[in-house]
Structure formats: structure tokens, C-alpha cells
Regions:
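Small-residue-rich hydrophobic transmembrane alpha-helices
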Residues: 50-110, 147-166, 273-337, 370-384, ...
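Short runs within selected transmembrane alpha-helices of multi-pass transporters and secretion channels
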Residues: 71, 139-158, 166-174, 195-210, ...
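Small-residue hotspots at the loop-to-helix junctions and early N-terminal turns
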Residues: 47-58, 137, 196, 268-283, ...
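Transmembrane helical elements of multi-pass membrane transporters/channels
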Residues: 18-37, 139, 150, 173, ...
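Residue-level signal for short hydrophobic patches within transmembrane helices
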Residues: 9, 13-32, 36, 59, ...
């Protein structure tokens, strides 16, 4: 009998796409949290506020990368237990990981409130936007617990094959976020603080909704009194996946943050262009990123069930799908780069538009590289080799950072060199990851 959310049965391509589609839509909606702030702030307040929100978002993603890494790693453990049909181990891992990530969230919150000023100074944030960025981050981290709760339960539901429910709660949250943005900024004139408050309140609604749904509608995922213990084997398994995934996310976002610091040194105009272009860039490749996350769940369930033949066929299907989709998006971004920038920037800000268009056309040409890399990350996490995902991340981000600083120091290249360093890092990591896959495939029979 086919279990609800079982990815070990049925047609591979259809199963993957059916599971992925709600995740893709949900991920695009997730981007709307920050894009709504960026669009309304950029059009209603100005370029300085746009630069502040964009730079704050990059820092925020880096700081919560620990939480995201822990939830992603825990999600892989949940998928393995669900695929193997071990519900006792599943419930115990849910309890243990929830407590662990909750403690980390509290520590992170305290750390941010203590060290927010030294961090902003280290990033060379210009004085004209320093106050706005400080206020925005302070409010956002007051509600970081909502980010933890929503992402934890969304990861849990996706791990057991339910990618639709998180989408519904996220959709309600995004609509509320946009409505509150308009109300707080246009009606109450709260400025950038209003944008941050809108995001926190909207995330709170999503968090409350998803936790109530899980406890009422999915009793098999509700831990019991006997599950509320820190089993050594369970904790070791969670730590094995979560720690390395956490390191991967931290390294990834540290590299991005270092590049952000370099971009900041070129002034407010380049910062604003980068902020707007990165939102478009993230929006463009986010579907294939979620496809990689869905692919990881698919591989983990089949690995737990011992379906190695299905894993091999799934790899081929996923790579073809990712490449075709990435090529289509590359063409669209290249052609419509300037109109896309005008969504966030006023037409008279020509310097910002020109810098942003250059970024998008360089990045957009190489979306196949990042699409393949997301699949490789997901594959290695799912087959109990999360360390390989870390290696690929270090390769990709290390190349990006080194080349960014080198190219930017050459006057003839300047800021454009930063844009070129990003796809070069993707392609180098792809080559290494594919070569290692051929070896692992032979050894593990997958």
C-alpha cells in the first residue's frame, strides 16, 4: 500500500515534479518576504533605504544560516527514517532536533543583539544607511523564533512527502506581509522599521499556523512522552547531518557576506544595484534550488528504503530537468534584465540600472551551473555524505571570494570582476561534484 508522501514508488519524473512544484511556488513566495520590502522601500523611500534592506538581507541570511543548516540536516534524517518506515526513530529525532535548534536560536538571538554594531562596522556599511540597517536588523531578529518554527515544521512536512501544506501557510503570510508593508510605510510612515515589522508579523502567522496544523492533522509526527528523551544514537545521527549541513550553509553565506563587504566598498549606487539584482537573481534560480531540495528528499527516502536502482534513474531525470529549466530562465533574464531592474529602481537612476543589468546578464548566462550544483548538494546529503556538500561549497565560495577580490583590484575590470567570479565558482564545483558522483555510484551501487 502506498503511504502518504511516499517517494519510493511511482514514476520518477512525475513524482519528482509533483513533489517539487509546491516547493518551487513556496520558495518563490518566500522570496516575496524580502522582495516586498525591497520593492516598496526602493520606490517609496529611496535608494539609500534600498541599499540598507538589501545589505541587511545578505547579513540576515548569513546569521540564520546556522538554523537553516540544522533544519535541512534534520530534514534529511526525517526522510531516511520515514523511507525506512521507522516511526519511533522519526518521532524521537523530531523531538531532539526541535530542542537542539530551539537552543541554538536563543543563543543566536542574544549574540546578534550584543554584536550587531561591530558586525556592521566590519562590513563597511556607509554612514548614510548605517542607522536604517541597524534598525531593520534589530526588529527582524526580535522575531527570529518565528523563522525557526516555520522552517522546522516546513522541513518536517516536506521530509515526509507533504510539500503542499507549507505552501498554503506561506501564501497567507506573504499576502499579509505585503499588506502590512503598504500600511506601515505608506499610511503610518514608519519607514524601514515598518518593513521589518511587517515581515516579523507575517512570519509569526505562518509559524503559528503550521505548528497547529501539524499537531492536529498529522498525529504520527506528534512526539509522545516516551519520545521526549535525548537518545544517544538519535542525537549522533542528527549531529552528523546537521553539523555538516550547518557548516555548509555558514560557509556559503560567509562567502556571500565577504563579497557583500567588497561590493559595499564601491559605494551606495553599486550597493543598491547589487541589492536589486540579487533579488532578481535569487528569484530566477530559486525554483531549481527547491528542485534540488526536493531531489534530496527523494534520494533520502529511496536510500532509506534501499531502492538504489531508483536513485540512479532519479539522478538522470533530475539533471535533465534542471538543465532544461535553467536554460529557459537564462534566456528570459538576459532578455528582460533592464525591465526587471526597473521594478525596483526608478528610471532616472541610470547608474544603478546599468550596474544591475550587467550583473544579471553575466549571472543569467550560467544558471545551468548553479542548477547542477544544487542537485549535487542534495544528492550527497541524502546518501549520508554531507561532508562532500561542504567540500563543493568551499570550492564554489572560495573561488568566488578569491577571484572577486583579485578582479576588483584590477582597475580595468573593477566591480564587473565580482560578477564573473560567481559563475566560475559554480562551474569548478560542478566538475568536481560530477567526477566524485561517478566514483560514488560505482562504490555504492546507486
Amino acid at each position: 500500500m502506498l503511504r502518504k508522501g511516499d517517494l519510493t514508488q511511482g514514476g520518477i519524473t512525475g513524482t519528482l515534479l509533483h513533489f517539487t512544484l509546491p516547493m518551487m511556488v513556496g520558495s518563490l513566495l518566500q522570496q516575496c518576504y524580502n522582495i516586498a520590502d525591497t520593492l516598496i522601500v526602493g520606490q517609496c523611500i529611496g535608494a539609500g533605504a534600498l541599499a540598507a534592506v538589501g545589505s541587511a538581507y545578505t547579513l540576515m541570511v548569513f546569521l540564520i544560516s546556522v538554523l537553516l543548516g540544522l533544519t535541512m540536516g534534520s530534514g534529511t534524517v526525517f526522510s531516511l527514517h520515514y523511507g525506512a518506515g521507522n516511526h519511533v526513530a522519526l518521532r524521537r529525532s523530531i523531538f531532539s532536533s526541535f530542542v537542539l535548534i530551539g537552543i541554538v536560536t536563543l543563543i543566536l538571538n542574544v549574540a546578534v543583539f550584543i554584536w550587531i554594531d561591530p558586525i556592521l562596522q566590519l562590513l563597511q556599511v556607509p554612514q548614510d544607511i548605517y542607522g536604517m540597517m541597524h534598525s531593520y536588523l534589530w526588529i527582524i531578529f526580535c522575531g527570529i523564533v518565528f523563522t525557526f518554527i516555520y522552517n522546522f515544521y516546513a522541513s518536517l512536512l516536506r521530509a515526509v512527502g507533504d510539500s503542499v501544506t507549507p505552501l498554503w501557510f506561506l501564501a497567507v503570510s506573504v499576502v499579509l506581509n505585503i499588506a502590512l508593508d503598504l500600511f506601515f510605510i505608506l499610511q503610518l510612515d514608519w519607514g524601514i522599521q515598518g518593513a521589518a515589522a511587517a515581515t516579523v508579523l507575517a512570519q509569526g502567522v505562518a509559524a503559528l499556523g503550521i505548528i497547529i496544523y501539524t499537531y492536529r492533522r498529522r498525529p504520527e509526527l506528534r512526539w509522545h512522552h516516551e519520545d521526549m528523551c535525548f537518545d544517544r544514537t538519535c542525537l549522533k545521527e542528527i549531529a552528523s547531518f546537521s553539523t555538516l549541513t550547518c557548516i555548509q550553509q555558514s560557509v556559503m553565506n560567509l562567502g556571500i557576506l565577504m563579497v557583500q563587504g567588497l561590493v559595499n566598498s564601491f559605494g551606495t549606487a553599486v550597493m543598491a544595484a547589487f541589492a536589486a539584482a540579487v533579488k532578481i537573481d535569487s528569484f530566477a534560480y530559486m525554483p531549481v534550488q527547491e528542485f534540488g531540495n526536493a531531489f534530496s528528499t527523494f534520494i533520502a527516502q529511496n536510500f532509506g528504503a534501499g531502492r538504489y536502482d531508483r536513485i540512479h534513474r532519479g539522478v538522470r531525470s533530475a539533471f535533465v530537468t534542471a538543465v532544461v529549466f535553467s536554460l529557459l530562465v537564462s534566456v528570459l533574464v538576459f532578455v528582460f534584465a533592464e525591465p526587471l531592474m526597473l521594478i525596483f529602481v526608478r528610471p532616472d537612476e541610470t547608474e544603478i540600472i546599468a550596474v544591475g543589468v550587467a550583473y544579471l546578464r553575466i549571472e543569467g548566462a550560467f544558471y545551468c551551473g548553479i542548477g547542477i550544483l544544487f542537485l549535487l548538494y542534495g544528492y550527497y546529503r541524502a546518501i549520508r555524505m554531507p561532508g562532500m556538500s561542504v567540500v563543493l561549497t568551499v570550492l564554489s565560495l572560495g573561488t568566488r571570494v578569491v577571484l572577486s577580490y583579485w578582479f576588483a583590484s584590477i582597475p580595468e575590470i573593477g566591480v564587473t570582476g565580482i560578477w564573473w567570479s560567481i559563475p566560475i565558482g559554480w562551474l569548478i564545483a560542478d566538475v568536481v561534484g560530477i567526477w566524485c558522483y561517478r566514483y560514488v555510484k560505482g562504490v555504492r551501487g546507486s
